[in-house]
């Protein structure tokens, strides 16, 4: 029997208030946005064995990075916000995970009768760099 192990660190529904919206009027007031990140691992993460924060994706560092990027400027679209967040997460934590998933939700878009948030997701499988032989 073959057993496939998968491990995940999930930071779910981190709420931020951001200047986000297509129109100047919509961006006038901060909008509630929920951000979720999942770090997936194909092998047991080092942090599971070592119990060292240096081997983990520290969720305080992850949420601090999200705050830093999201608060740098107003955004018109959640797609653009998500892409900027995702690029920064891959640069900062891509060496610690096999896959990163990001979900950005605009809780209260100005759409009549819409009961749930608008969501945009990005996902990337991170492959180790090939070893080049001489």
UniProtKB/Swiss-Prot annotation:
Pfam families xref list: FolB
Molecular function in Gene Ontology: dihydroneopterin aldolase activity
Gene this chain is encoded by: folB
InterPro entries, A to Z: Dihydroneopterin_aldolase (IPR006156), FolB_dom (IPR006157), GTP-CH-I_C/QueF (IPR043133)
Family in the record: Belongs to the DHNA family.
Active site: 106
Function: Catalyzes the conversion of 7,8-dihydroneopterin to 6-hydroxymethyl-7,8-dihydropterin.
Reaction catalysis annotation: 7,8-dihydroneopterin = 6-hydroxymethyl-7,8-dihydropterin + glycolaldehyde
Signal peptide location: none
Keyword Lyase: yes
Name of this protein: Probable dihydroneopterin aldolase
Keyword tags: Folate biosynthesis, Lyase
Enzyme class: lyase
């Amino acid at each position: 029997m073959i057993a496939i192990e998968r491990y995940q660190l999930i930071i779910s529904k981190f709420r931020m208030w951001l200047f986000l919206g297509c129109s100047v009027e919509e961006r006038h007031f901060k909008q509630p946005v929920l951000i979720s990140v999942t770090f997936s691992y194909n092998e047991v993460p080092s942090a599971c064995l070592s119990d060292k924060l240096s081997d983990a994706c520290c969720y305080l560092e992850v949420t601090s990075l999200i705050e830093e990027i999201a608060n740098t400027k107003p955004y018109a679209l959640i797609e653009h916000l998500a892409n900027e967040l995702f690029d920064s997460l891959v640069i900062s934590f891509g060496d610690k995970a096999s896959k990163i998933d990001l979900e950005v939700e605009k809780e209260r878009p100005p759409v009549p009768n819409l009961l749930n948030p608008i969501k945009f997701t990005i996902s990337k499988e991170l492959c180790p760099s090939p070893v080049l032989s001489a």
